[in-house]
Structure formats: structure tokens, C-alpha cells
């Protein structure tokens, strides 16, 4: 853990880049840090530092979500770079669930593509209410009319998924040119729009502490660190938490708190933190569990839910499903197989239906009434739901 202290002298906002594979999300993230590093407001992160894994480097695509930190004159931003490849959408869901607002990156050269649409849908499902659009690769397009058509297409898409497409700000630029230092105007404009268009988030600090575990690391001689974004509440060093879901519930004492390699005296809703846990070994905690105030939450495996099943046009199923259908259910940072039971008077569920479902999961998950989830099958999102009542 670090010896530097994190200063809370600016509003902290979580943002991130979403969009189709190869449209420039990671290049844009790298360009933002490079430009702000010249003003002392960020640490310059190269493309290779953001796309970290061997497979990412070999394939030139982002697989895992990556966090970087930067500041403007007005705010401190935690920025998640989300994978755009269809195979890694579950990691994108985890990243998007941590954002207060999203930057949708669309290549002006290619226009709207399948993951553009899916990411906009998922952003809405995980509770993002505002997007900013960065039209990238504008330097490759000679006709102004083409860029205008792409912008109209994206605005229509945003309206379709209940974002305000007419008022959403669009910024044009080239992330690659900005990274090369030849055209930084688009990036400066984007940062200006982030500061102005995205309101200061209202943090849910009064409710009991809850943090979904996104990653787990070991610090030799110190203990195990759980990383994630605090969903609600506050926590201090020496307080006790419960580790809930997937396995037997365990208790642990917090011995350290850190955000972007700087120490915290407390963590609160909205913070991206590492929490050092005393007496917990690496194999006793995993991604998909949650840390919570003792007694505030339990793990369950059967519940009643209200769901919307996507139409074929929205990228969902082409056909109906029946009782005992077994898709994947995505909660916060985990996915679990479960089976569906339809209510007695319902014979089948069609794409486009809103309906009540009884869901039974293979493993217990920390849930309560109001917990949101996505339903996926065969690499695509087929529905979105909310837990309405716990059964067992």
C-alpha cells in the first residue's frame, strides 16, 4: 500500500470509454492522459500500458477493463477503458456499472456497428443516464456530409435506448492525431464537455457500506487486497466487513484503504479503491462477491424478478423461451447460470415481452429487492431485469 495520501480537494467522477472494437477507445484514453500529463494533471499512460495483457497486445484489442486516473482544473476523474470486442462484453458490463457517465466512441469512418448498439443498451441497463459522443477518426473522412450522417445515426440510436439523443453533446476529433501531438483540440473540447455536461454525482453515503469485488491481489507480508468501486455507504480502517456470495460468508477487518496508489483515511460511494483485509487468504475471496457492512446483506439463490426481453432488432433472441430455460445472469461483477420458471398463467415469453420470472441461480449471490441484472446467452444480451422479491 502507498505512503502518498489522496486529497479530496475536487469532486470525484467515474467515467469511461465504451463502443465498438477498434473504434479508438483505448487510443482516446491514452491521448487524454498524455495531454493532461503536460499540465501535471495526469500520469501519461501509453496505449500498451492500458492494453496490458499479452493477448491484448497480440490481438490489438482490449479484453479487461483498465482504470486510469486524471484531473481537470475542476474535477478528479477515474476513467474505465471498456473492451469493445463481443467476446468480452461481460467485462464491459462490470466496467460500465462503475460509471457515472460514459464516453461513447464512434468511428466517423465506420459509423454505428454491432457493439456500438449493444454498449448503448448495456449502459442504460446499468444505470448510466448520460453519454457524451466522441466521433473519432474524423481525419480519415473527406466529406463533411458523411460525418453529419453518422452523427444523425448515433443520435437516433441514443433516442431509441432512452438517452436524450437530441441534446447529447458530440465532439469530433482524432485520438491518434492527438496522441501523436498534431491535433489536440478535440481532446481539450471533450474534457471541457465532461466538466460542463456531467453533473456532480450524488453519492449514496448514508446507506450501509457495499462494494462489489472486481479484483483480488496479494501483498506479501500484508494480506489480501480486494479492489472495486464502492456502491454505497462509507468505510474506515479498522472497521469490520462481511465477504458475501458464492461461498460461505466470512468476516474481515480492514487494515488499509487506497485509491490510485494513494492512501485514504476513509472510502465512500463512488470511490475506486483497494481494501486491505486482515486474516483473509487469496483463496477465500473472489471476483463476484461483495464486501458489506455486517448484517446488512445476505446471499440468496432464488428470487422473483421483473424483466424485459429484448427484441431481435435490439440484438436479442429470435424465438420464445419456456420454463426451465437456462441463460447466464450478470450481477455487478459476476455471472451465474440459473434457470427460469414462468408464472402459472404464462406459457412462454416472446422477444419484446415485459414479464415476471422466478429465477433460481446455481450459486447464491448477494442480492436484495431492487438489485439489477442482465440476462445473456450465447455471447449476446437477451434481457434486463430487477429483483422484486427474495424467495430463498
From Swiss-Prot:
Q: Where is the tr-type G domain?
A: 10-202
Report the EC code(s) recorded for this entry: 3.6.5.3
Has keyword ATP-binding? no
Q: Where in the cell is it found?
A: Cytoplasm
Where does this protein hold Mg(2+)?
26
Domain of life, per UniProt, equals Bacteria
Q: Which family does the record assign?
A: Belongs to the TRAFAC class translation factor GTPase superfamily. Classic translation factor GTPase family. EF-Tu/EF-1A subfamily.
- Name-wise, this protein is Elongation factor Tu
**Recorded name of the encoding gene:** tuf
